[in-house]
From Swiss-Prot:
Known role: Methyltransferase that performs automethylation. No other methyl-accepting substrate has been identified yet. Component of the velvet transcription factor complex that acts as a global regulator for secondary metabolite gene expression. Controls the expression of the oxalic acid gene cluster. Also controls the expression of proteases and carbohydrate-active enzymes. Regulates sclerotia formation and plays a role in virulence.
Disruption phenotype: Impairs the ability to produce oxalic acid, to colonize the host tissue, and to form sclerotia.
An example Gene Ontology biological process: methylation
Enzyme class: transferase
Name of the protein described by the UniProt record: Secondary metabolism regulator LAE1
Gene it is expressed from: LAE1
Length: 327
């Protein structure tokens, strides 16, 4: 069906998959958590029901943190008779893609949304203008049409990508020249405090250091990529903009909006600590599940302690495709 969409838009197709292309291997269990079988071990985070709940909580958090919108107000679409064509990379449970399909299927006629992810964890009942494919976004995008997407969306893929420059090059190639929009939303999990509330030997600081190093050794660092602007500039993206939003780890601020953001972030983070930590610590450092449980119990205590006035930063990047695609 993706190929049919491509032909309808007269785009040039990426090469077809090789004849030996096979169904991905089954998912597998490790330390009581379910992980996807496609490119086993490459992605360190689980894909079970608890993880799906975490992803959906994070979706609500992002919506609250961004002022109740599904995408940045900087991301606008040109008039398009058929509605915008939107590509969601690393779609997870597909909840953002579903909301976008509902919005642009009703608001703008026949907008189309396609979500790609390593794991098939999306619901079976979805809007008619939405499709999900099980794909590794770092591999060739078989059958997708180049220069034909109005928006490419990335959210929370730190820790999953080996080469950001290669991914940005693909994004540029598949966006409509000059009018296609790119949006990337990432959390910098570095614990910060303007009041000196985070000792270097605290559980929170120790957790972040160890997790950053473990994912770096896996060649897919969770640490925030500080070179995003330079990488987008190298691909000649236009109108590059960054919005930084402070996200408190618990409701310690006085501002009501920040308190609301903090409540959702605290829920998402405390719910997701095991999922974020278990795979990297076990596979890289050889920690047992009990080792991880002890650490994240202390980290939760720090995260929920209102005397620790800590926060992370949420980065929202937007850009417009260059006039000409790469040669």
């Amino acid at each position: 069906m993706v190929v049919a969409m491509a032909m309808a838009n007269n785009g040039s197709l990426s090469p077809a998959p090789p004849a030996a292309f096979q169904e991905p291997p089954p998912d597998y269990t490790e330390n009581g958590r379910l992980y996807h079988g496609l490119h086993k071990g490459k992605y360190m985070f689980p894909c079970d029901e608890d993880e799906k709940d975490r992803m959906d909580i994070f979706h609500k958090f992002f919506e609250v943190a961004m002022g109740g919108v599904l995408h940045s107000r900087n991301t606008t679409f040109t008039n398009n008779y058929d509605g915008p064509r939107i590509l969601d990379l690393g779609t997870g449970t597909g909840i953002w893609a579903i909301d976008m399909a509902d919005k642009y299927g009703s608001d703008m006629g026949t907008g189309e949304v396609l979500g790609l992810d390593l794991a098939r964890i999306q619901p079976p009942t979805i809007p008619e203008n939405l499709q999900f494919l099980q794909r590794d976004i770092e591999s060739p995008w078989w059958g997708l049409e180049v220069e034909s997407w109005d928006m490419v969306h990335i959210r929370m893929l730190s820790g999953s990508i080996n080469s950001w420059p290669a991914l940005y090059q693909k994004v540029r190639r598949y966006l409509k020249p000059q009018v296609g929009r790119f949006e990337q939303v990432e959390i910098d999990f570095t614990p910060r405090s303007d009041f000196g509330d985070i000792p270097a030997d605290s559980a929170l600081a120790t957790w972040a250091r160890n997790l950053f190093e473990a994912t770096r050794r896996n060649f897919r660092p969770l640490a925030y990529n500080t070179e995003i602007r330079a990488m987008l500039q190298k691909e000649e993206f236009l109108d590059i903009q960054e919005e930084v939003i402070r996200i408190p780890l618990n409701p310690w601020p006085d501002d009501p909006q920040e308190k609301d953001v903090a409540r959702w972030y605290n829920l998402a983070l405390t719910q997701g600590l095991e999922a974020m930590t278990l795979g990297p610590m076990h596979r890289i450092y050889g920690w047992t599940k009990d080792d991880v449980t002890r650490l994240i119990t202390e980290v939760r205590r720090d995260i929920c302690n209102r005397k620790i006035r800590a926060y992370n930063n949420l980065h929202v990047w937007t850009a417009r495709a260059p006039v000409k695609p790469p040669s």
